[in-house]
């Protein structure tokens, strides 16, 4: 994929297309590094598919695959509701026509269930990812946002308190504060053999609240290895 990316003549690209090219190159480079570090090269921790391109052949819509352990739901309807874990999560990224600009932020939406206070679990906006953060500006790179979502999935980063910028899903946030943190469920290892660690009593509801983040290039919507 890097060969395809490098064939573009940057002098012939508009400012927007040059930005799309740069974002693509950074994402692809991140993917290559993750693939090289993976125990199974066919299953890197993050991979991508290009779902849509513009007239210049530059990506305007991606599908990101995360292969990490994360919470995808809870058991039962009454407390204590233990977490249900999954290991493959798919998220779409749509870059609007006015991207990049303050009013043209990328739209991140999970296509698989994710149980996280900053990701909508149900309803008409199901899967929507809230990336508001005081330490990341509106012009944060696509690569940095993809890594931020990886931190979300691992529960290394979350905002469950009912304070600005407010949780995206209040039901999940309440579960985090009242059930998950007291039971240590927000601190789960990626290694299945390692038991969960108890929560820090002094950090309840503040996982940055909890803070401690790629992929495979594609051709014709098929994941390639490099």
Predicted segment positions?
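Short, conserved beta-strand/beta-arch hydrophobic-aromatic motifs that form part
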Residues: 95
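UBC/E2-like fold recognition across ubiquitin and ubiquitin-like conjugation systems
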Residues: 1-88, 98-226
């Amino acid at each position: 994929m890097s060969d395809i990316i490098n064939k573009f003549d940057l002098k012939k690209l508009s400012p927007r297309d040059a930005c799309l090219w740069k974002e693509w190159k950074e994402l692809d480079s991140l993917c290559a590094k993750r693939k090289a570090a993976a125990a199974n090269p066919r299953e890197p921790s993050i991979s991508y598919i290009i779902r849509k391109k513009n007239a210049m052949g530059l990506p305007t819509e991606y599908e990101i695959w995360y292969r990490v352990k994360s919470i995808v739901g809870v058991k039962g309807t009454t407390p204590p509701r233990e977490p249900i874990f999954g290991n493959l999560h798919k998220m779409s990224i749509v870059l609007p026509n006015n991207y990049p600009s303050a009013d043209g932020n990328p739209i991140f939406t999970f296509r698989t269930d994710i149980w996280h206070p900053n990701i909508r679990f149900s309803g008409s906006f199901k899967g929507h990812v809230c990336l508001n953060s005081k330490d990341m500006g509106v012009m944060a790179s696509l690569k940095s946002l993809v890594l931020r979502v990886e931190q979300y999935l691992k529960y290394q980063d979350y905002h469950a308190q009912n304070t600005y910028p407010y949780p995206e899903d209040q039901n999940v946030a309440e579960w985090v504060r009242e059930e998950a943190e007291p039971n240590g469920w927000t601190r789960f290892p990626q290694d299945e053999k390692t038991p969960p660690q108890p929560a820090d009593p002094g950090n309840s509801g503040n996982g940055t609240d909890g803070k401690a983040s790629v992929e495979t290039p594609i051709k014709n919507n098929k994941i390639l290895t490099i």
